[in-house]
Amino acid sequence: MCDLFSDGEIRKESIAQIVNERNFSRVKSLFDDAVAQGATVAVGGQFDETDLTVHPTMLTDVTPQMTILQEEIFAPLLPVMTYDNLDQVIEYIEVRDKPLALYIYSQDDSSIEKILSRTSSGGVTVNGVFSHYLENQLPFGGVNQSGMGSYHGIFGFKAFSHERAVYRHVN
């Protein structure tokens, strides 16, 4: 995000609108709650209520008690938590509802594999954000509380189609 928006200038047409005022207020409330509890705005943080836009925003110094880490956001807000060891991260993920998406930032393949083998989530992007959703050749969907089934491309076609089995005995 810092590389993309380092000059602070984002063209208005490149920012997606939040679907309606109710959801805009929900997203703004998640942001305000996090900042009020000590989160730091590392990038972004601009909200425009007149056209319901939110600039891509990264929050650091985020804690598990903040509402932003307890709900699915569905907006360009990226809360970032730090940790002391990998087992701490895995435990954090395991004791909560399965997330719709999991973003892993690491150059260490063994750490990435350890997280993947010990956690469950909808989709995963390694060293990026949202890419698994944007790739139509990959299924997209959640697990348990975050949804069921897979969508996108052929996966969505199959999910919303009924395959009718017919077995005919030959006399």
Task: Show the residue positions of the predicted features.
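ALDH superfamily catalytic-core signature
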Residues: 1-63, 86-87, 91, 126
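Conserved C-terminal structural/oligomerization subdomain of aldehyde/semialdehyde dehydrogenase
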Residues: 2, 46, 53-171
